[in-house]
Regions:
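Short, hydrophobic alpha-helical packing/hinge segments within bilobed ligand-binding/sensory domains
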Residues: 98-99, 123
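N-terminal small-domain helix-loop-helix segment of the aminotransferase-like
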Residues: 9-94, 101
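N-terminal amphipathic/basic leader segments beginning at the initiator methionine
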Residues: 5-7
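Basic/polar N-terminal segments that are highly enriched at the extreme N-terminus
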Residues: 1-3
Length: 139
């Protein structure tokens, strides 16, 4: 068997998953753990996704994101007062992937990352997998 990355041996089960499991087992408990919407995806979004599939948009997008999406994000950022070119935009599936990708790109083994706490529990996992050490900063 191929040995796992030694950083993985330092990981603990995510506290948010522990609390989510507990909430699911507790009758009448309101779950405020994962930040997941309590409604289905709106119909216009589902229709747009279906239309895209019907038009053959079934392949991987470019690594940085589609040119159209990157241009739209750049325009939105520019309107917010942050002049941005599409070439400066990298699209990810969410904030966690963005943080993970950024830290893998800049963090060297053993470097410390200061994180204001309380914080989302996945941050420590991301830092650990990237080879760093989380330093909590009470705020």
């Amino acid at each position: 068997m191929i040995p796992l990355n030694s950083n993985l041996t330092q990981l603990k089960r995510s506290a948010i998953r522990v609390y989510t499991d507990l909430a699911r087992r507790t009758p009448g408990c309101v779950m405020l753990t994962l930040g997941e919407p309590d409604f289905d995806t709106p119909a216009p979004i589902r229709r747009a996704a279906w239309d895209a599939l019907e038009q053959g948009q079934t392949h991987y997008a470019p690594n940085q994101g589609t040119a159209e999406l990157r241009a739209a994000i750049a325009r939105a950022e520019t309107r917010r007062g942050n002049p941005t070119a599409p070439e400066q935009v990298l699209v990810t599936v969410g904030a966690s992937q963005a943080l993970f990708t950024a830290l893998l790109g800049i963090l060297n083994p053993g470097e410390e990352v200061i994180v204001p706490v309380p914080a989302f529990s996945l941050y420590e996992t991301i830092i650990t997998i990237a080879g760093g050490k989380m330093v909590p900063l009470d705020v």
